[in-house]
Structure formats: structure tokens, C-alpha cells
Amino acid sequence: ESAVTDRLSSSGYKSNVTGFSVGTKFEYLDDLKLGVSTKNLIEKITVDSTASSKQKKQEGNYFDSFIGLDFNYDKRNQKFQTTSGFFSNYSIDVPVLSETNTLNNSYIYKIYKELYENNISTFSLLFQSTTSLTGDDVKLSERLYIPGRKLRGFERGKVGPKDQSDFIGGNYISTLNATTTVPKLLENVQNVDLVMFADAANIWGVDYDDTLDNGEIRSSIGVGLDWL
């Protein structure tokens, strides 16, 4: 696998990753699937000339090897156009060989409910963390950003701590999201729902300079289209 993440304009760095991953999933108990994987990555990080001195220290080449575990408990009534039930997913990447020894955690929970006829309402939460087991600074590319779909109305990647003019992400993010469909307004349009939404999110933690941490809750409320 190969991937390029270009955040030079917004976050002051660019990452080129090459590597491979191998994994498998199996049903451990009813509705509970366990995934086990391993990935080995070679990464090159370059930083912008205007980046801070602490960011420039992270420029260079890296090799990382991780073992991943994924636990997925799925009680939805159906995978597509779900109307009831919930799913809960926890994943962790444990460093085996890594210069920064970064441990990644992610937990997602989402519940679906039909409050009235032809309505689908959801509530979800997300928590992610990226920290070093040995107290090192995690790489610029390992820092977390709030997904755009989790905080609508804000520019993607431009929320949270800043180092000079660069949005540098955080060691932790959390989000809460609620949506409810508005039936009958678009009932003649296929694969599109009109939804009301409320989002709240926080991003915090700057391990390489705690004076840059400005964690605060951002929120938005609105109406949008959901493409199925």
C-alpha cells in the first residue's frame, strides 16, 4: 500500500507512506467480530520552510510496525438504511517496532431509532487517542484531526491547536453527533434524506509543546442532505 498526505498548506507537513498490512476477521461470539492485523510502514515526513523549529525536528524517515486489534459488536437490524439497533467498535494499534512507540486507540458507538413513521434518528460518539508509550512526541502524521462529517460547518482540518499558522491536530479527539431525518419533504427523490443535525467536538493535547493546547468544545446545528 502507498499513501500521500499533503497538509503543507494547513498543517505544515507532508507524509509519504509505503508498506503492507495483513489481517483477518472472524465472528468470536454472536454479533461480535474480532479482527487481528499487522502493518509495517516506511514513512518520509517533510515540513514547510515556515514550520516551527519543533515541527522541523520531526522531518525525516521512519519505520513502524504495529499489531492491530479490532472488536466490533453489531446489533443493527440491517447494514444498509438501518432503522434500529446499534453498533460498538473499539480498535487499537500496538507498536512492535517504532521510533515514537505510538499507541493508537479509537472507540465508536452509534445507535439508531425510528421515533415516528418514516423517521430515522441517530446518536453517536467517537473518542480517539494517540500517545507514546515511552513519553516521546508522536509524529506529525500521527496527530489527530476531527473528521469533517463529525463537525459540520467548520473547515476540515482547521480546528484545534495551532503552532504559528499551522493547525497541528491533537493527541485526543471526542465528538458527539445527533441526526434526525425529516420525512415527506424529499420522498420523491431517491437516495437522499433531509436531516437535522447537532454536532459537538473537542480536540486537545500537544505533547511536544503543552503551551499550544487550546482545547475547547466546538458545536454546530443545522439542516443538510444525507446521500445514502
What are these regions (language model features)?
Residues 23:
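Phosphate-binding glycine-rich loops and their immediate beta-loop-alpha structural context
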Residues 2-6, 14-20, 40-44, 65, ...:
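Transmembrane beta-barrel architecture of outer-membrane proteins
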Residues 5-14, 26-31, 47:
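C-terminal structured domain segments across diverse proteins
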Residues 199:
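Short basic (Lys/Arg) and small-residue
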Residues 29-55:
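Acidic, glycine-rich low-complexity/disordered segments
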Residues 207-228:
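C-terminal beta-signal and terminal closure region of outer-membrane beta-barrel proteins
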Residues 1, 28, 78-80:
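Outer-membrane beta-barrel pore proteins
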Residues 46-191, 196, 204-206, 211:
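C-terminal outer-membrane beta-barrel translocator/porin domains of Gram-negative envelope proteins
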